Amino acid sequence: MSDQEIKSLVYNSEEIISSNVVEYTNRIIEAGITFDQELFTEYVQKALAEFGLLEVYNTIILPTLERIGILWLTNNIMPSQEHFISELVKQTIISNISFDNKIPDSAPSWLVFLPENEHHEIALLLAKYILKENNQKVIYLGQSVPKESLEIVRHHKKIDNILFS
């Protein structure tokens, strides 16, 4: 794919939310297509400073992932490009999850995981972020968790809620 074709695919947006949001989305897609982690980081950090993680997720990340998905389904990008951008999104969410906030002992606990053979954990990571920001205890098991292993967790920890996707 030529540079002009890439730019045409990236900048062809029918959604006009705000010029900044469109710019962030376009640049993040460009970063994914060209494997440019520095460009991704630059624009995501600007967006986070302007909007915060939840707003960035809703107004920039989701439309970006939708457009990346369309590009992938129409064979305009390779799986490696889609995986690259998805991994950077996951890293962004993880880096915003606080690991040092003191959660009260009385706080409800959540067991958070994806069932076996499910690997798309971006939304689950965001759920973890939201729960932690709301002072909830989270036991995050991640992706593709075998059903049998859940009993082990319940044996060792009191679980008030279960969240899976």
For every predicted segment, state its role.
Residues 72-165:
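C-terminal regulatory/effector modules of DNA-binding transcriptional regulators
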